[in-house]
């Protein structure tokens, strides 16, 4: 995955090539400006919301689209399967959704000498940095549903960077079937002074990896000399394991 750290509001230029862009933090002005520029072309779009439920299942809904058929929004894959009918295209009016417990995907295809498809995956970031450590195990805050949704989404973002088996990658592959997607063809954009989101891309919060490290470290503390000390090490390991 390419990681682009933004300084002085200088963003990469996306040429006429398909692209999947993960936007961490507030990049709404960039998205709005980009869409304004491509609105001069024939354009079809759909917008998805991703919201975790109380047990952590991701609910994905299409909430906007260029066109409906019999009251149902059609998506970009259907637009392509219909052979790009221009009459279904429309301009896209970007809305500044300020919502930390929802992830949005803007799936846009436009014609500029050739059909170009852009996916913007938009996540504002951690709502409260005091819950940062809960990214390792979001279920520690499951009693606070708003915080739980936000921290679970942060965990999913972290996994897409550090784990081959990513829920978000699986989801994108269902939305984008033109060819198989993996994280290595994605671009992640974050602002240089957005410290919480920078941690998401440079610090691994994977619970299984934490457990493996803790287990290995505590195993190295066990000796053949003292049963009592070994029991203390084991108790400490069990106490820490319960907290992550």
Curated annotation (Swiss-Prot):
Keywords: Late protein, Virion
Organism: Swinepox virus (strain Swine/Nebraska/17077-99/1999) (SWPV)
Compartments where located: Virion
Highest taxon in the source lineage: Viruses
Protein name: 27 kDa core protein
Stated role: Late protein which is part of a large complex required for early virion morphogenesis. This complex participates in the formation of virosomes and the incorporation of virosomal contents into nascent immature virions.
Main subcellular location of this protein, as a coarse class: virion
A GO term from the CC aspect: virion component
Induction (UniProt): Expressed in the late phase of the viral replicative cycle.
Residue runs in coiled coils: none
């Amino acid at each position: 995955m390419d990681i682009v750290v933004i300084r002085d509001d200088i963003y990469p230029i996306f040429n006429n090539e398909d692209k999947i862009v993960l936007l961490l933090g507030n990049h709404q002005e960039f998205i709005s400006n980009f869409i304004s520029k491509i609105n001069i072309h024939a354009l079809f779009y759909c917008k998805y919301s991703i919201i975790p439920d109380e047990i952590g299942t991701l609910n994905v809904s299409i909430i906007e689209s260029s066109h409906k058929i019999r009251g149902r929004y059609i998506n970009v894959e259907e637009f392509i399967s219909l052979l790009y009918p221009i009459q279904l295209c429309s301009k896209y009016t970007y809305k500044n959704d300020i919502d930390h417990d929802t992830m949005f995907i803007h799936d846009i295809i436009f014609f500029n000498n050739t059909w170009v498809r852009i996916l913007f995956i938009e996540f504002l970031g951690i709502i409260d940095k005091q819950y940062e450590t809960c990214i390792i195990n979001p279920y520690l805050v499951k009693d606070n549903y708003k915080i739980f949704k936000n921290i679970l989404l942060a965990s999913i973002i972290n996994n897409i960077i550090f784990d081959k088996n990513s829920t978000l990658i699986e989801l994108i592959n269902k939305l984008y079937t033109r060819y198989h997607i993996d994280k290595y063809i994605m671009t992640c954009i974050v602002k240089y002074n957005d410290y919480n989101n920078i941690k998401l891309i440079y610090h691994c919060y994977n619970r299984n990896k934490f457990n493996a490290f803790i287990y290995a470290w505590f195993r190295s503390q066990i000796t053949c000399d003292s049963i009592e000390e070994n029991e203390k090490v084991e108790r400490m390991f069990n106490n820490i394991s319960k907290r992550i």
